[in-house]
Curated annotation (Swiss-Prot):
It is a peripheral membrane protein. Belongs to the adaptor complexes medium subunit family. Delta-COP subfamily. The modification Phosphoserine is found at residues 223, 244, 493. Residues 271-511 form the MHD domain. The gene is ARCN1. One of its GO terms (cellular component) is Golgi membrane. This is Coatomer subunit delta. It is found in: Cytoplasm; Golgi apparatus membrane; Cytoplasmic vesicle, COPI-coated vesicle membrane. Gene3D superfamilies: 3.30.450.60, Mu homology domain, subdomain B. SUPFAM superfamilies: Second domain of Mu2 adaptin subunit (ap50) of ap2 adaptor, SNARE-like. Residues 167-177 have a biased composition (Basic and acidic residues). The modification N6-acetyllysine is found at residues 233, 241, 309, 351. The coatomer is a cytosolic protein complex that binds to dilysine motifs and reversibly associates with Golgi non-clathrin-coated vesicles, which further mediate biosynthetic protein transport from the ER, via the Golgi up to the trans Golgi network. Coatomer complex is required for budding from Golgi membranes, and is essential for the retrograde Golgi-to-ER transport of dilysine-tagged proteins.
Amino acid sequence: MVLLAAAVCTKAGKAIVSRQFVEMTRTRIEGLLAAFPKLMNTGKQHTFVETESVRYVYQPMEKLYMVLITTKNSNILEDLETLRLFSRVIPEYCRALEENEISEHCFDLIFAFDEIVALGYRENVNLAQIRTFTEMDSHEEKVFRAVRETQEREAKAEMRRKAKELQQARRDAERQGKKAPGFGGFGSSAVSGGSTAAMITETIIETDKPKVAPAPARPSGPSKALKLGAKGKEVDNFVDKLKSEGETIMSSSMGKRTSEASKMHAPPINMESVHMKIEEKITLTCGRDGGLQNMELHGMIMLRISDDKYGRIRLHVENEDKKGVQLQTHPNVDKKLFTAESLIGLKNPEKSFPVNSDVGVLKWRLQTTEESFIPLTINCWPSESGNGCDVNIEYELQEDNLELNDVVITIPLPSGVGAPVIGEIDGEYRHDSRRNTLEWCLPVIDAKNKSGSLEFSIAGQPNDFFPVQVSFVSKKNYCNIQVTKVTQVDGNSPVRFSTETTFLVDKYEIL
């Protein structure tokens, strides 16, 4: 099969996006596409037409056509299979099959087309692999960003907690008719109330702003910042200033959850000479009225050996999954040994695993539409009121053995209507006025904290608050597949090993 070009065009033959896989001029491809509508015979059910030099294989998509231009001696069955893959790629990047939407995402489509065909020949890829390749996803980068964002949120939360304590102390002192104490009296390291307020204000505000360069140190002389020991109103002004900057004063329940999240972040894993990475990624789509449209989970065990004396080993796998996952071992792994004894070892026991490289020894896949398999259910209830919409969002953890960390539930908002008015909330929130989104942030969701809700009001229509997107990380995998023991092939002696488990979100949407 030689594929000359792939294009999306209108019914009149106007090219919207076209990718040529062989050397071809713009005039040539435009001429081929312009001639295409004239060759079609509406009275026939064929999805291909031929000329003296090329063959058009096409599929209608509402008002557009997905067209493949191939040589006449290509395999028509392979052409049709490739055409179906091209047609499935387009809805992945375009919400509507319209000319404006295709033009807006033309580069994304071209990158995806290049993953399907190389130099005119079809690559052996599926839709999930195309999505992964075009996203250029990095697990390490996601983990690094998640840890950094959590540290920033914890620092902001601590500053807000201190500000609230200062405000409460001031009010208590005013009730008793006393003047609130300042922050002096600690010897040579004494700090005035004014400089402390300046430090707190600067820390909280700077956290949300991109850091261009390190801020210069403030002089220890007189400061024009707020002085907490002066007037009672200045403390209230300080808190109001936080609110005007878009910050939210944290409640006591939020402080409790933040402390729990800080306990979760353990120091980096001490990697042994035999190290395993167990990674799972979930793709899930639910309907706003309930029902699981699709859930797909991919998992893999990656083995890394840093000492060649441990090259000839076997992994003892404990599979407690009851959801019906499909397991697949590496081609060099003894499949009979794994099926009979749940041991991962090479077919030739005299050979060693590669050293200083990550080797995928076992992978699994789960695809279902069973609602009971959803790890975290999200219910979004927008109801129209006189001034706009009252939105109530609830979450519930269905898998009690999971512990989800750094959970962010992102709700789209109408543009140009201002910030939402928050009612009750479990956790904390961020309003991104540039992207018109409301982010509901929850440090930890586990069996002790398995449900919560958020209520807010804003102008808009119910459809404005979808799709809702969810992201999280977890150090417990979903399918309950673990490596419990590692032994050497000779003598069956145990080997020390370390394990790193990660459960990530690839795509989690409520449409």
